[in-house]
Amino acid sequence: MVLFKAKFSFQRRVKLAQTLWLLSWLSVLVGCLTFGMGIFLKVQLWIHNEVMENTSAHAVPNTVITAGLVGILLGIYAGKVSQASMDVTKYQRWKSFMMPFFFLAILSCLVCLAALVLSVALRGTLEESLKIGLKNAIRFYKDTDTPGRCYQKRSMDKLQMDFQCCGNNHPKDWFEVQWISNRYLDFSSKEVKDRIKSNVDGRYLMDSVPFSCCNPSSPRPCIQMQITNNSAHYSYNYQSDELNIWVRGCREALLSYYTGIMATNGAAVTLSFLLQASVLVSLRYLHTSMDKISGPDDMEADTEGFILEKGVTETMNTTLEKMKGLFMSNQVETAEGGGEAAAAS
């Protein structure tokens, strides 16, 4: 049973070819946008790689980049075919590439869907990766002399200033770690000794945050040391006053930032998917309607176009049989070539 059959006069085929040409180049433009958005997300993930536990989130930009690149190539091909369809002799050169094109176009649509699914599915993975990565970044903040962690302090300070955030979930995350290196502590000082002895793990903990947590918009000089001690600062109440440090955690800030980029990527991929599907359907109609035209004399004849010549199940079975036959013929040719080589030796 033929699915979605339609009759095409010469004028309708011309309009179909023109529409396909327009859709093809729109698909190329959107493919370029999708490719660029994927590259941008990839770069942003790479920039903050030090505060992430793993790189599983990179699957999203990788898929988006693939979808954009394939969309560009298929759009260019479809545009060339639409131009060649006005000349039977030129069109004959493209006919043999039609089935591989349809196969790749369907794969491209599936890649677009995969990119959309990954954008949603990997949000939880990204959040967990940021949670662990930021926790480690805060813990290793002081290790500026340790190989592999030399730039951890710079990365964390830049992150907190750029995203106006402090700590992992909140500024108190800094209270739980020793973020000042021992090389900068005066161990002859009674205050330092008492603070280290008061801690079970022998760490120098204090209710303070790095300078990068300070809010420069605050009219008051930044209170970054002894934050919870009201008596240490004039006219200050930790419980009721608005703190002049950033109170939002960096995990929330980064997750919100990446979620926004992924949403934009999702919109670009969705548009790319719709255009590629439209190009696929239009080219299929053009191909099947041109299939019965054998020469220039038949160009103005009325023809029929369709999406599938048989039902979905029958088409899939036929395609599988063709692929199986092609695979078997390749095996036979390989075996014959091996036998001839053995006989010659």
Swiss-Prot record:
CDD domains hit by this protein: peripherin_like_LEL
GO cellular component: plasma membrane
Main location: membrane
Subcellular location field: Membrane
Pfam families: Tetraspanin (PF00335)
Record has Disulfide bond as a keyword: yes
Regions of this protein lying in the Lumenal compartment: 44-61, 124-264
Annotated glycan sites: 54, 229
GO biological process: visual perception
Cytoplasmic side: 1-24, 81-99, 291-345
Mode of membrane association: Multi-pass membrane protein
Cited Gene3D superfamilies: Tetraspanin
Annotated tissue distribution: Rod specific.
Regions crossing the membrane: 25-43, 62-80, 100-123, 265-290
Keyword Transmembrane helix: yes
Keywords: Disulfide bond, Glycoprotein, Membrane, Transmembrane, Transmembrane helix
Quaternary structure and interacting proteins, as annotated: Homodimer; disulfide-linked.
Family named by the database record: Belongs to the PRPH2/ROM1 family.
Stated name of the protein: RDS/peripherin-like protein xRDS35
Gene source species: Xenopus laevis
